Amino acid sequence: MHIIFQYPIVDLRDIVSGGNGRLNDPKWPDPQERRQSFVSGFGKVKSRNLGGSDNFTGESYYCDSHSAIKFKELQHQGFSEGITTPASIFNSYRRYYNDGRFVGKVEIGLIDNLEKIIRNYPGSEGIQISSILKHYSNLEATVEDEQVKLYKAGPRLSKKYQRESTLREKHFQINPDYVQTGELTIVLTYSSHERLIVPRRSFSLEKIELPNDAGSIELFGYKLKQDGYPTKVWIIKIPANFRSKSGKHKTILRDLRMNLLRIHLEKETIKILLNAIKYKQIELEKESAEAKQVNAYFEQTSKKLFRKSRYDIKQENLLDFALQSEKSMDKGSFNSLKENITYFQDEFMLDNLGKLVGSMAVKPMLFVCSNPRDSNFIDFDKEYKDLKYNLQRAIDRDHYDIEIELSVTKDEFKDILDRYKPQFLHLSMHATVKDGLHFEDKNKAILPMSVKEFKQIIERYTKKHELKLVLISACNSKNHAKAIKEYCDFAIGTKAVFPVPAALIYSNNFYTTLFNGYQKDLEYCHSGAINAIEFNNPKFDDLDYKNKKIRVHEIPVLIKNSKYV
């Protein structure tokens, strides 16, 4: 089993006036330059035994950084839970890479014999990969004479790098804002075995068929949480006999691992650069060499990030998960930031940066309820609690912010949208074909909102804000959904009276799927929800559909914006 911990380190000192005491050559301008020592205290540039990958020539050399992070008796700290003989770590590496500008990373690799033990000492008890990840994430190492667990080592390594790359007489002037660490990511590769169990909350991202009918490589995404530290994990499952495969097959695996690590590093670097500009940690003058350097990096990297594939590895299906960030940026902040970075003129690049920030941003969701007096009671509390419960258990639980507004009047609706700025809007209320959506007035009496009025409010809102989804959980609301289809990505309404039990099943299943990595596949969320209604066959007393031509699971209707048709 091979586990890689990647710690991005972004050095902004090249684009900060004054130099800040940085050594003349602590960076890595050319991988061929391996004669000089690299960063004092980190190590020296060496050749890789495997020569890197055909597609990543810059990986042919690395900085051996054993002096930066140290372990004690590492070989005896292998995984032991649920097996008769503890695993041992028989190989490890600690490496620093740098692109010669401001992008760096420390990668720690651990290779154990757990798979060999499982094969030689068979048993019936399953071994959770989540337990293996927790074990190795909690290994202790020494950085700058301090003990630290691996999943918390990033800031220490960043501090160590900054210190070792600064002139001694300038150590007292070190500014931690100029060298920052990005979020940790982990890549775990294992051979398929019935006892090794992929985490229940992981989800499949890609399946790569190997040449010559040699099986397939499967890729899963997973969020590992420890003490409030969420870590993005890539789990790669390879065929059981993969070790005996040809060099071409192994190159595919290496390229996949490198691509995952590079996407993460590029995303973290862009995030740190944007935040540094936003909070004025760095100030770039138009047409300056520093502004041009940042502009060039943004332009090149944003193009690479949004390609459909890179080095023959498809990355389209990976990006939703890859571009998520635990320390999110606010998309509104990016819009105001864009107004201030006038030295960035490339609209295509700015559009890509906007998409990247959108992927990293927390998605605001607003739950709007209205239940005028003399209407049948709607149990909003049940629907909302189910929604929150599903979010807490979900993979993407940290990427949605849910707000609820009860007893909303017709006059308040517009102002509530402006206040919360939702990307996902859920309306739960009664409605009729003749009158429209049943909002309340100030006396809690019914005050309907027509299709025309609803359209005008949504049209106005989307001139300033993005709406990905409007879900109208109300009877006979198809016309309202249809009227706003050009102002949001997707709208969901109903084409008949929608019984409450069926509505609860739909909502529960739709959001469970959405929160588990499918925010860009709302059609998939919708189809799963209507299937759940059909399979559950909910009982209800308010209507008898036996003599109707329409079936209950056919009542919810998904309407697409024309750009998706």
Swiss-Prot record:
Probably a dedicated protease for substrate gasdermin bGSDM; cleaves the bGSDM precursor, releasing the pore-forming moiety, which integrates into the membrane and triggers cell death. Involved in defense against bacteriophages. Expression of bGSDM and this neighboring protease is not toxic in E.coli. The keyword Transmembrane does not apply. The keyword Hydrolase applies. GO terms for biological process: defense response to virus; proteolysis. Keywords: Antiviral defense, Hydrolase, Protease. Its EC number is 3.4.-.-. It is an enzyme of class 3 (hydrolase). One of its GO terms (molecular function) is peptidase activity. It comes from Gillisia limnaea (strain DSM 15749 / LMG 21470 / R-8282). Coiled coil: none annotated. This is Probable protease Gilli_2517.
